A protein has these predicted regions:
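N-terminal export and membrane-targeting signals
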Residues: 1-11
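Subset-of-secretome marker
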Residues: 2-4, 20-265
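C-terminal motif of bacterial Sec signal peptides marking the signal peptidase cleavage site
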Residues: 15-18
């Protein structure tokens, strides 16, 4: 597979973790054991609690397809109340590092990367996307880029599997499955379009009631290529102040006016 074609799978890694930022209510458990029911309630309450707070998320991931690998790492700071945030991701492929930057400003997200800079008009550095219509207009790749880093979907069949210290915080580790019935129509559509299948989810919840780490393994498909994806997100600084600098209007271009592979439905 050519390098550029493999890079088109990267948004799927973001999509796999982009289905929990809607602030949904804690999901009720459908399990039959008390311990699992309690664990399910605890984890979903932690997800809902964190979805309301500003947070810093460090993200690392591995995308494997056709015998090739993409490693990605980065971090972001997002405030769901003001709908503002910044995200930077570095994508490693074939000895090269491809940067991807995002700025969220209310109902608009700006995306910049050398990956698609050749598609942009002269003098333009940033794609401008409308958050509300990103999925319908541009497909699942763009939908993923409008979601909160480190977000988690509602979970079910949760079981406690151990304890661990994450960045100095004592946590309880759980394994779980995604409760797809609790996803929004837009989230379901994006996952269906990319043939996303979730594996077991691992979640680390601290005594403060917040999720401090999550690991998601999935398989997905884009452009006829199937990929196996593993993404780990480590969350910290809940309640922090988030500052953003919006790109100058003269450097932005409406994404609907630019044809970029992976960003059209």
């Amino acid at each position: 597979m050519r390098g550029r074609a493999l890079l088109l799978l990267v948004p799927l890694a973001l999509l796999a973790t982009a289905c929990g930022s809607g602030g949904s209510k804690p999901a009720a458990s459908s399990t039959t054991t008390t311990s699992s029911a309690n664990a399910t309630a605890t984890v979903n309450q932690a997800i809902a609690k964190g979805a309301k707070q500003p947070v810093h998320a460090a993200v690392s991931g591995l995308v494997t397809a056709s015998g090739q690998q993409i490693r990605m790492s980065g971090s972001g700071d997002v405030d769901p109340k003001s709908q503002t945030g910044t995200i930077h991701v570095s994508i490693g492929l074939g000895g090269q590092q491809v940067p991807l930057d995002e700025v969220l400003d209310g109902k608009t997200v700006y995306v910049s990367s050398s990956f698609f800079s050749s598609f942009l008009p002269s003098g333009k550095k940033w794609l401008k996307l409308d958050v509300a219509s990103a999925s319908n207009t541009f497909g699942p790749a763009a939908f993923a880029l409008t979601e909160k880093p480190g977000a988690l979907p509602p979970l079910q069949d949760v079981h406690q599997v151990g304890t661990a210290t994450v960045d100095g915080v004592q946590t309880t580790k759980y394994s779980a499955k995604v409760d797809r019935s609790k996803l929004s129509p837009a989230q379901k559509s994006a996952l269906k379009s990319s043939h996303v299948t979730f594996g077991t989810i691992e979640v680390w919840v601290g005594s403060d009631g917040y999720v401090h780490r999550a690991r998601i393994e999935t398989s997905a498909q884009a452009g006829g290529q199937k990929a196996n994806i593993a993404v780990t997100s480590t969350m910290s600084n809940y309640g922090e102040s988030v500052q953003v600098t919006v790109p100058p209007a003269g450097q932005t271009v409406d994404a609907s006016k630019v044809g970029i592979p992976g960003f059209s439905s």
